[in-house]
C-alpha cells in the first residue's frame, strides 16, 4: 500500500440505518445516524509507489468513535470499525457498520491503511518502511452529536516523501537504473505511529529503498523515483543515497537545511556523469509540488 494532487472527496455511504418497517431514517430516542465524508489532503501513495487520485476498489479505512472523555460512546464501542470502498473516482461509495449518535458529544478519527490486527494501543502502531506504504490519519474531530451528525475528516500524510529526479549527463554507459536505497544516522526504517494524530515514537534507523525499477535514464526529461520516509528533525538530517545503475552502485551524500516534515516532498535533481553523481538543488514542496525551493550543498562521492 502506498501518493501529487488536490483534495479528493470520497463520500462514504452505508452508514444510514433504516428500520425494517419504515421508509424514514431512524431517529428513535433522538438517535441520529452518523454521516461520514472523507477528504484526502493531496495525493495518496498506493502499493509499489504507484500514484493514485483516490482510494482503489476494495480499500478499507479504520474509524474510531468515542465519547468526549471516554473510550465508549453511549455504552457502545466503535474501535477500528472498517469501512470499505466500492467503485472508483467520483462514483465511489463506502459501506460499514451503523453508528448512531445521541445528544452526547463524541469525537472521531480515521486512519489508512486498515488493519484488523491493529494494536489495542492505537498510539503505538508498528510501521516498517520496507513495504513503502503510505500512512494517512485524520486527527480528532471533536464535534459529533445527533445535532451535528455529518462528520468530515481530512486525511493527512504521516510520512515525508523524498523524490530523486535522475537524468543522464555525460555518462557513456547504458544508464539503466534498477534500484535506489537511503540510509542515515536519523533515517528511520521502523517506528511506532499514533494513528490518531500522526506522531511517531520508538523510531529505529535502517536502510530503506526500492529495487527492480528498470528505468532507462536519459538527458531529458529526468526520471522520478520517490521513497517514503519517517519525518526527520534535528541536526542529523544528512543521509546517503545509493543508486544502482548498470549493475554498479553510485553513492551520494545529501541533506537539507530544514527538517523533513510529514506531508512534504523533497525533490533532488541528480545527474549521472562519467565521474559519478552530482546534485543541483533540493526543492521543498507540499505533496502537490507547490512550495519553496532552496539550494543546498551536497558532498559528492565518486565510485
PLM-predicted stretches and their roles:
Residues 2-8, 19-303:
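Sec-type signal peptide cleavage vicinity
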Residues 10-15:
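Hydrophobic alpha-helical targeting segments used for export or membrane insertion
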